[in-house]
Amino acid sequence: MGGGGPRRPGTLPLLALLALLAAHGGAAPLQPGGSPALTKIYPRGSHWAVGHLMGKKSTGDFPYAYEEENKIPLSASPENIKQLDDYLQREEMSKHLLQLLEGNENKSAHFSKGGLPWHTRNSWETDDSSSWKDVSRTRCVSAFLTVTFCSKVAYQLCPTSALS
């Protein structure tokens, strides 16, 4: 049977015992009191509260945040009214700017391609892909500015409901 030498009868149980001890000894070392070292298991401390404060914002910037619920979150101070007016003016200016840009692009596209000035074309009727990209980009910018403005105004008017 070609075993290479005589087998000892206790070799297999000895190897099994050695494998069992090696697998059991790979755990975290014990502290002098007998409990495992938590710094080895959790290097940054306990993880029981992970995610508890995720997404929460500080309310220190807003007056009357947690005092009484019948008070408005922002007072009608001249600073707040001025800030809201500034937001409204920026939105109006950006809308006018985008309308001017779209008007200039449409006029240059009509006259350069021999189109009639009274003929209005939709964005899917353009001849090349670059004009379509320009139209869609200006619409995306307009939508982005509108969403940004609306979210800022909503957050300024009611910051507690905007978070949920």
From Swiss-Prot:
PROSITE patterns per record: BOMBESIN
GO terms classed as biological process: neuropeptide signaling pathway; positive regulation of peptide hormone secretion; positive regulation of phospholipase C-activating G protein-coupled receptor signaling pathway
UniProt propeptide residues: 58-164
Listed InterPro entries: Bombesin (IPR000874)
Location, primary (coarse class): secreted
Signal peptide per UniProt: 1-27
Positions carrying Methionine amide: 54
Keywords of the record: Amidation, Cleavage on pair of basic residues, Cytoplasmic vesicle, Secreted, Signal
Top-level taxon: Eukaryota
GO cellular component: extracellular space; secretory granule lumen
Location within or outside the cell: Secreted; Cytoplasmic vesicle, Secretory vesicle lumen
Record keyword Signal present: yes
Keyword Protein biosynthesis assigned: no
Function: Stimulates the release of gastrin and other gastrointestinal hormones. Stimulates pancreatic protein and fluid secretion, and increases acid secretion from the avian proventriculus.
Family according to the record: Belongs to the bombesin/neuromedin-B/ranatensin family.
Cross-referenced PANTHER family: GASTRIN-RELEASING PEPTIDE
Protein name (record): Gastrin-releasing peptide
Species of the source: Gallus gallus (Chicken)
